[in-house]
UniProtKB/Swiss-Prot annotation:
GO terms for cellular component: mitochondrion; nucleus. It comes from Lachancea thermotolerans (strain ATCC 56472 / CBS 6340 / NRRL Y-8284) (Yeast). GO terms for molecular function: DNA-binding transcription factor activity, RNA polymerase II-specific; RNA polymerase II cis-regulatory region sequence-specific DNA binding; zinc ion binding. The lineage of its organism: Eukaryota, Fungi, Dikarya, Ascomycota, Saccharomycotina. Keywords: Cytoplasm, DNA-binding, Metal-binding, Mitochondrion, Nucleus, Repressor, Transcription, Transcription regulation, Zinc. The gene is OAF3. The keyword Zinc applies. It is found in: Cytoplasm; Nucleus; Mitochondrion. The keyword Transmembrane helix does not apply. Its main location: cytoplasm. Residues 22-51 bind DNA. This is Oleate activated transcription factor 3. PANTHER family: OLEATE ACTIVATED TRANSCRIPTION FACTOR 3, OLEATE-ACTIVATED TRANSCRIPTION FACTOR 1-RELATED.
Length: 802
């Protein structure tokens, strides 16, 4: 009877839930921190691919005699669900110009503008009309050096000179100060262009006499470089490099006329580059050092380095430079790549793409010389093989594997950094896991993180259409904590640690913005609220760092600011491109005055950027003009919703012709079809809300009122006397700015007036063939992200321009 009753009771169901600890930690019987998608133990031990939190199949009990190890081989392992986002929803973007064709990598600011439908529409609305005109003959190269520099600017820029020459003298007022600023900036940036296109054949023939004198170099330049700058680009052995440079100086003394060989060109290139770098360091450190400029600094700053980079490029191409390479030539290539990153002229281009070919040459040279992971993995064996291949005794060899190891570490640093900033595939596609001991020297400290960094890069570049945002953010946080620890312990150079921290923050900013756009397209309101709040907080974090960097006298070594200025410039570029997405969505905010607060914050960011970085760096300065158009477009109607005005303008235009690019987006294509059924301009905003992102579901609250007191740059009165951002480009008008007072949402409201709206530019009127669009083209090549050129049958309107 008892046996029958027991048989009637159903068997107990096995509880099915994910394991609390990961399967690896459970097998190792180690404490698991339970982090997902990869726990700390698996990340440290290199078991990222097998770290999972599995489910044990229900109703499948292990039979007697079957070992747990064998049973575990057949268990179903189910990892956490990934959060896949699309970084290229509109496809692969290619920009074609006369000079080059560029791939718009998925993490660049330009890609963010094309990924977000709000920013995509804003960019098209902010475009100036493009017209064609014949080029005027260049002015004769006579007169002062200042006039010659301005003559190196494009044709449309030469009319700025007529303002300076023909304007009557004015007292020391705001207008005269603005005119002087125009003269200084255009002369300086014109000089950059002239130096890059100047002929250097005669200079190369007399190269030994063009470099700094031996006494000046080794007394004033060399000590500064080695004590302050060598740690930023650790590719040299001090004793060996000094020996090589002194030897080439002695060979080419004024009394000798030897013929230059491969190593001579490489040594002179290094001398020229070191001189340029020391001069840049001294220039940007002046405002952050209490000491007055001493005589040694004056000597270095007095050296004319205007043709040095052109001479370096000429040296590198000599003696079969594309077919053969030596260690010194490779080091000169790396130093040139370092200079392009730091230089205030063209630098790496709008998309950080101008040095890609140089990096490819550097990586190929490394492989041809045997500089790769083997010199890190087996340094002792590598040294023996290296010396024997030279046919020298070990004591006679000038270099050893430590030089190769430092070079390989530096190449990896540049390759991984550019991949994280742009989303392009790494040129070096493999890595190895290294034990921590033995790799803690400052020059090789980043090697132990390379495997993790490469994994992050591959998660983005392998398939930008399917990126696991959760996994990327998780791995970035692990990388941040590891770098933070090493930076505090001075294992990593502080300037490099600061740079990597900014790189991680900027990648998080881009991923968060892409996730926000993805949540709207996939109709996930909860994810959207989390993402837009996280995006705003990330902007606050980065701008706070930039504020402390620009205005604080403490922190980084002033001599390294010429290097770290670049990553701050990239940060400003990314924020100025992404932040308008918050302003355009401010109409959904349930908090009053959100748009006004965000717009004021945006103005403060732009003002700080262009008054500090913009007056020194050519790439930043030319971004000011499209940024000014964006700011004027967003602030065109006071407290009204800017997105409503943009939609009304688009649908009231011939959007099939003037906004043809939007037709490629499925979102706008269906929006236009729906609008054609109603035909009511005033209903455009409500139609968009009903179709794409309903205001009731996608409303948000950023709590800007409490954040307002903490927003960076908000309490700065540094530019009350003269603000470069406020002064320039006030009178140029797009079709939107000309039409905006007549849109239904504004009811004829006039645009606001600023102090510089009254600046006299009447001298520009009446000049034959003058076109303001060419002025903008100079500073933003290809116009406002000219992935497609808008056609226009109308005659170009006259625009006032500053």
């Amino acid at each position: 009877m008892e046996q029958d009753r027991a048989s009637d009771v159903p068997p107990a169901k096995k509880r099915r839930r994910p394991t609390v600890v990961c399967t690896n930690c459970k097998r190792r019987k180690s404490k698991c921190d339970r982090l997902k998608p990869v726990c700390g133990n698996c990340l440290r031990l290199g078991d990222e691919t097998t770290c999972a939190y599995g489910l044990e199949p229900a109703g499948e009990a292990r039979k007697p005699g079957v070992s747990r190890l064998v049973a575990q081989c057949f268990e179903m392992v189910r990892s956490t669900q990934p959060t896949l986002i699309d970084l290229q929803p509109n496809g692969v973007l290619i920009q074609c110009k006369r000079s080059c064709t560029s791939y718009i990598a998925p993490l660049t600011p330009s890609a963010a503008k094309q990924r977000d439908p709000y920013l995509q529409a804003l960019g098209l609305v902010c475009q100036l009309k493009r017209t064609m005109r014949a080029a005027d003959p260049a002015p004769k190269k006579e007169g002062t050096a200042e006039a010659t520099s301005r003559g190196s600017l494009p044709n449309s820029m030469r009319y700025i000179e007529s303002i300076e020459q023909n304007s009557p003298e004015q007292p020391a007022s705001l207008a005269s100060r603005h005119k002087n600023m125009c003269r200084q900036l255009f002369t300086k940036f014109g000089k950059y262009r002239r130096n890059h296109t100047s002929s250097t054949e005669d200079d190369l023939k007399a190269l030994p006499s063009r470099v700094p004198a031996k006494k000046v170099f080794f007394r004033h330049i060399w000590p500064y470089f080695w004590s302050h700058l060598s740690g930023l680009c650790p590719i040299f052995d001090e004793a060996q490099l000094e020996k090589s440079l002194k030897r080439v100086y002695d060979r080419f003394s004024p009394d000798t006329h030897s013929k230059l060989d491969v190593e001579d060109y490489a040594c002179f290139s290094i001398v020229l580059l070191i001189t340029c770098l020391v001069q840049l360091s001294l220039k940007f450190a002046q405002d952050y050092t209490e000491e007055n400029t001493n005589s040694e600094s004056s000597i270095v700053m007095g050296i004319d380095t205007s043709k040095f980079i052109s001479m370096v490029n000429g040296c590198i191409s000599r003696k079969k430079g594309d077919r053969k390479c030596s260690l010194l030539r490779l080091q000169s290539l790396l130093l040139l790549r370092f200079y392009y990153w730091c230089a205030p002229d063209d630098g790496d281009g709008d998309y950080l793409q101008h040095s890609n070919m140089l990096m490819g040459k550097i990586v190929a040279a490394c492989y041809s010389m045997g500089i790769e992971w083997q010199c890190v993995r087996d340094p002792e064996e590598f040294v023996n093989n290296f010396n024997l291949c030279l046919g020298l005794m070990p004591l006679e060899a000038e270099y050893d594997a430590s030089d190769y190891k430092k070079i390989w570490t530096t190449v990896l640093h540049w390759d991984r950094k550019l991949s994280l900033l742009t989303g392009q595939r790494c040129l070096i596609g493999n890595s190895i896991k290294l034990p921590t001991p033995g790799h803690e020297s400052p020059s090789c400290a980043l090697l132990k993180f390379d495997s993790l960094i490469l994994k992050i890069c591959d998660m983005i570049s392998n398939d930008p259409r399917r990126v696991d945002a959760t996994a990327v953010i998780r791995l970035l946080e692990t990388l941040r904590q590891s770098l933070k620890k090493d930076t505090r312990e001075n294992i990593v150079n502080p300037a490099l640690g600061f740079e990597w921290g900014m790189v991680i923050a900027l990648l998080e900013l881009t991923i968060t913005h892409a996730h926000m756009v993805h949540s709207e397209k996939t109709e996930s309101p909860d994810e959207f609220c989390d993402c837009i709040q996280g995006l705003f907080e990330k902007v606050l974090q980065i701008t706070k760092i930039c504020e402390q960097y620009l205005y604080s006298q403490e922190g980084l070594d002033p001599s390294a600011r010429f290097y770290t200025n670049k990553i701050v410039d990239i940060a400003f570029s990314s924020i100025s491109a992404i932040f308008p997405s918050l302003i355009l969505r401010s109409g959904r905010s349930i908090e009053p005055h959100t748009k006004t607060t965000l717009l004021n914050f945006y103005r403060d960011i732009l003002s700080a950027s262009f008054n500090t970085i913009g007056v020194e760096y050519y790439s930043c300065f030319r971004r000011m003009f499209p940024s000014k158009l964006v700011f004027r477009t967003l602030s065109a109607a006071g407290d009204e919703d800017p997105w409503t005005r943009i939609l009304e303008f688009i649908v009231s235009s011939d959007y099939n012709k003037e906004f043809a690019l939007l037709q490629r987006s499925g979102i706008f294509k269906q929006f236009f079809k729906s609008y054609e059924k109603t035909g009511n301009v005033e209903s455009a905003a409500s139609l968009w809300s009903a179709y794409y992102a309903p205001n009731d579901l996608y409303s948000f609250d950023l709590d800007v009122k409490s954040f307002g007191l903490q927003m960076p740059f908000s309490h700065s009165n540094r530019y009350n006397d003269y603000d470069v951002f406020e002064a320039f480009f006030n009178n140029a008008k797009t079709l939107f700015l000309a039409k905006v007072p007549n849109l239904p949402a504004l009811n004829g409201t006039a645009l606001g007036q600023g102090a510089f709206n009254y600046f006299d530019y009447s001298l520009l009127q009446g000049i034959e063939n003058f076109d303001s669009a060419d002025f903008l083209d100079f500073f933003e090549p290809g116009g406002s992200e000219a992935l497609v050129e808008l056609e226009s049958q109308e005659s170009p309107s006259n625009h006032d321009i500053c």
